[in-house]
UniProtKB/Swiss-Prot annotation:
Protein name: Ribulose bisphosphate carboxylase large chain
Organism listed in the record: Lepidium virginicum (Virginia pepperweed)
One Pfam assignment: RuBisCO_large
Binding, Mg(2+): 201, 203-204
Residues annotated for substrate binding in this entry: 123, 173, 177, 295, 327, 379
Entry's Gene Ontology molecular function annotations: magnesium ion binding; monooxygenase activity; ribulose-bisphosphate carboxylase activity
Active-site residues, record numbering mapped to chain: 175 (proton acceptor), 294 (proton acceptor)
Gene Ontology cellular component annotations, sorted alphabetically: chloroplast
PROSITE patterns with a match to the protein in the record: RUBISCO_LARGE
Keywords: Calvin cycle, Carbon dioxide fixation, Chloroplast, Disulfide bond, Lyase, Magnesium, Metal-binding, Monooxygenase, Oxidoreductase, Phosphoprotein, Photorespiration, Photosynthesis, Plastid
Family of the protein in this entry: Belongs to the RuBisCO large chain family. Type I subfamily.
């Protein structure tokens, strides 16, 4: 044995590999109010015990690595390590388990969603001992939440800016999403806004392409906003997509939007990235701009039930990073969305305090303390016949977006907007009168058709449209 080896042995360092569960599985651990808690759906490889799999997740997403290292002795693992403190089987799934992991707050940089995700989900999802892994939920403690600005303005400030109360807001995505010139695009915006919508929207992939450069689009949309406001007496907006290839270019576009005096800009927060999104949210708060968030790419991450990350986690991350609106599915339209699960993360977006409720997929009680709420946006394959259900499901604090359901009207954009506004006002009035939208919804819409030919035409066009496909990402036990 060499002198160096003898020296290392004499200080008690023992090289080699040991089971993760010996260090990182701690069922006796009592979680702290300052811990970030995570619920992982773990599918171990055959032969790997769930305790070892859960401990491996805790280790590889905090202080651990595959072998013992001598530098472990230079820090306090007991202070900094993640701990798998509970494991439970998933009902109806023999090979899946929910592993609960607690992370000490000191592992994370203040005010950084980027760092939080890099730690918790950055590396462990490719671990060979796991056949699949999904992050189902996070508990963000108030001590960490308070390090974030969150949404630039929040629900109440937005309503005050727009002077609109007592009903959902109405929007429309301009179609076709790609190919229009800036002038024709602005014309479509104007027709929709003058017809009664509160907002129109750039689609997620409208940035600055050869057929329509961003500056031209911003100018023509601003003209449409001001003209429709003058005609209707209502405050209007268009979500000008500031998403760009660099953060500097993104902020430049937001600056130009502010100079035009428009009320709101937009960002694709997953493809753009959390660092860019947080920077834009800070700019929007400092400069009085509302911020609409599109979740493009989310289904790549959240759609499969056994691997990836549930959208409720992405929704919480957005509330931390900052956004005044975010797309949240429809339940009734063309996009994936279980009703109870959707209502669960809608609560997490809007409410100040949300209790644990496994029937809605909420694994932890979440206290947002003073962080403003986010308006959920229902968008994707919806039309006037969906209005009663959308009003009943999402309530007043929401934005209902009818893209094809506005521009697909046989008489044009403005009549399509009129049809949606009339249907919404009829549903809100009926609800306020005590009528049950879930039971009487179709009858309420038919009654409104008697005094709105635009709505009658829309109802005729879309009376047979259905999107009857089973939900893939169902809650456990369904």
């Amino acid at each position: 044995m060499s002198p160096q080896t003898e020296t290392k042995a004499s200080v008690g360092f023992k090289a080699g590999v040991k089971e993760y569960k010996l260090t990182y599985y701690t069922p006796e651990y009592e979680t702290k109010d300052t811990d970030i808690l995570a619920a992982f759906r773990v599918t171990p490889q055959p032969g790997v015990p769930p305790e070892e799999a859960g401990a491996a997740v805790a280790a590889e997403s905090s202080t651990g690595t595959w072998t013992t290292v001598w530098t472990d002795g230079l820090t306090s693992l007991d202070r900094y390590k993640g701990r798998c403190y509970h494991i439970e089987p998933v009902p109806g799934e023999e090979t899946q388990f929910i592993a609960y992991v607690a992370y000490p707050l000191d592992l994370f940089e203040e005010g950084s969603v980027t760092n939080m995700f890099t730690s918790i989900v950055g590396n462990v999802f490719g671990f060979k001992a796991l056949a699949a892994l999904r992050l189902e939920d996070l508990r963000i403690p108030p001590a960490y939440t308070k390090t974030f600005q969150g949404p630039p303005h929040g629900i109440q400030v937005e309503r005050d800016k727009l002077n609109k109360y007592g009903r959902p807001l109405l929007g429309c995505t301009i179609k076709p999403k790609l190919g229009l010139s800036a002038k024709n695009y602005g014309r479509a915006v104007y027709e929709c806004l003058r017809g009664g919508l509160d907002f129109t929207k750039d689609d997620e992939n409208v940035n600055s392409q050869p057929f329509m450069r961003w500056r031209d689009r911003f100018l023509f949309c601003a003209e449409a906003i001001y003209k429709s406001q003058a005609e209707t007496g209502e405050i209007k907006g268009h979500y000008l997509n500031a998403t760009a290839g660099t953060c500097e270019e993104m902020i430049k576009r937001a600056v130009f939007a502010r100079e035009l005096g428009v009320p709101i800009v937009m960002h694709d927060y997953l493809t753009g990235g959390f660092t860019a999104n947080t920077s834009l949210a800070h700019y929007c708060r400092d400069n009085g701009l509302l911020l609409h968030i599109h979740r493009a790419m989310h289904a790549v991450i959240d759609r499969q039930k056994n691997h990836g990350m549930h959208f409720r986690v992405l929704a919480k991350a957005l509330r931390l990073s900052g956004g005044d609106h975010i797309h949240a599915g429809t339940v009734v339209g063309k996009l994936e969305g279980d009703r109870e699960s959707t209502l669960g993360f809608v609560d997490l977006l809007r409410d100040d305090y949300v209790e644990k409720d496994r029937s809605r997929g909420i694994f932890f009680t979440q206290d947002w303390v003073s962080l403003p709420g986010v308006l959920p946006v229902a968008s994707g394959g919806i039309h006037v016949w969906h209005m009663p259900a959308l009003t009943e499901i999402f309530g007043d604090d929401s934005v209902l977006h009818f893209g094809g359901g506005t521009l697909g009207h046989p008489w044009g954009n403005a009549p399509g907007a009129v049809a949606n506004r009339v249907a919404l006002e009829a549903c809100v009035q009926a609800r306020n009168e005590g009528r049950d939208l879930a039971v009487e919804g179709n009858e309420i819409v038919r009654e409104a058709c008697k005094w709105s030919p635009e709505l009658a035409a829309a109802c005729e066009v879309w009376k047979e449209i259905r999107f009857n496909f089973p939900t893939i990402d169902k809650l456990d036990g369904q």
